[in-house]
Swiss-Prot record:
Its EC number is 3.5.4.28, 3.5.4.31. It comes from Bacillus cytotoxicus (strain DSM 22905 / CIP 110041 / 391-98 / NVH 391-98). Belongs to the metallo-dependent hydrolases superfamily. MTA/SAH deaminase family. Substrate binds at residues 94, 150, 189, 219, 304. Gene3D superfamilies: Metal-dependent hydrolases, Urease, subunit C, domain 1. It catalyses: S-adenosyl-L-homocysteine + H2O + H(+) = S-inosyl-L-homocysteine + NH4(+); S-methyl-5'-thioadenosine + H2O + H(+) = S-methyl-5'-thioinosine + NH4(+). PANTHER family: AMIDOHYDROLASE-RELATED DOMAIN-CONTAINING PROTEIN, AMINOHYDROLASE SSNA-RELATED. The keyword Ribosomal protein does not apply. HAMAP family: MTA_SAH_deamin. The lineage of its organism: Bacteria, Bacillati, Bacillota, Bacilli, Bacillales. Keywords: Hydrolase, Metal-binding, Zinc. The keyword Hydrolase applies. Binds 1 zinc ion per subunit. Its cofactor is Zn(2+). This is 5-methylthioadenosine/S-adenosylhomocysteine deaminase.
Amino acid sequence: MKTAYVSATIVTLNEQNEVFENGYIIVEDHTIIEVQHGDFFKHDQVDEVVDLKGKWLLPGLVNTHTHIVMSLLRGIGDDMLLQPWLETRIWPLERQFTPELAVASTELGLLEMVKSGTTTFSDMFNPIGIDQDAIMETVRNSGMRAAVSRTLFSFGTKEDEKKAIQEAEKYVKRYYREHDMLTTMVAPHSPYTCSTEMLEECARIAMENNTMVHIHLSETEREVQDIEKQYGKRPVEYIESCGLFKRPTVIAHGVVLNENERTFLAEHDVRVAHNPNSNLKLGSGIANVKAMLEAGIKVGIATDSVASNNNLDMFEEMRIATLLQKGIHQDATALPVETALSLATKGAAEVIGMKQTGSIERGKCADFITIDPAKKPHLQPAEEVLSHLVYAASGKDVSDVVINGKQIMWNGECKTLDEERIIFEARRYKHGLQM
């Protein structure tokens, strides 16, 4: 089926960063087959014409690191540093999770992402007490594109660790699909929660199954000091010695990196998921994204979980990301709007290995969102589209969401997720947690 979306301002995020005023795109099944100015196609050659009436059309946003199973933990443990936050609030609460609660929490995260314009995401979930197959089915039913990864920890006995590795390997073999809508990565939590043996086993699983790796790394000064004290190496060098960087790897955070480490990461195709709001809220610091990009590192913007953010609004992340770089470098040209948009779309898609999405171009997957600026004073005058998307817009402005050619949300109404039921169940299950 061919559908033409017409009368829109098209923000392509292609190599030339072209913006087509009064443009159109044609989608055939799941794929964009034409992007142009004006209305120069034969209407009898398409099955449906959708008039967007002046809306802005742009690539769906790509969240490179989050934890949607934690969505019910929003607002838990505010104003705490990372380590005590994890040890005294998050992990104890996650041990109370049931399969039903985890699904309700996941649905809440999916709903929030769709309504705020995210079409693709990379996730890590703690498998304790949950049904991983139910989580994957829930994501699949939402219509979103995702890499959903089972997190590994070295908690408990050596036998517990061995079982965790076996279960993770089964999960990877079951769900890894290179070009599917739903895939996975090998996801050891971090160098401070995984033993050397577990990290080496994760490297083996990734190599044998040709998967990517997703890990928290160099997030805080404390982490760097602790790993250096324990292993005689900084986190980047230590993880490299475990073999994980033999496969394309996404490190979440990368707040505490020196120049040599940035050069090393670029040379080994290690990508960074940048979580500006989460890093600020947990007092972890500010990642030097400008230096990363100059070193040649692929960077994608991310939200982290709602427990440390406290939302999944990628527009907000774009804005704070660019403002932070301008501020810490005292350079107003640092991370300009075009770059910020790329780090939340095309660049982010490359970070998580999904080059089939992230821009409005012929041959790309039909993943896009729209915003109607007409009745929004904060988006007027409407001519400066790129500026407004980064510095003025929010996820609440999103009108329509199309993923893989399918209308997932239209005029603010979700078609694959029951908003009323999801919010009701989220409230019900939250009351069951012993805070």
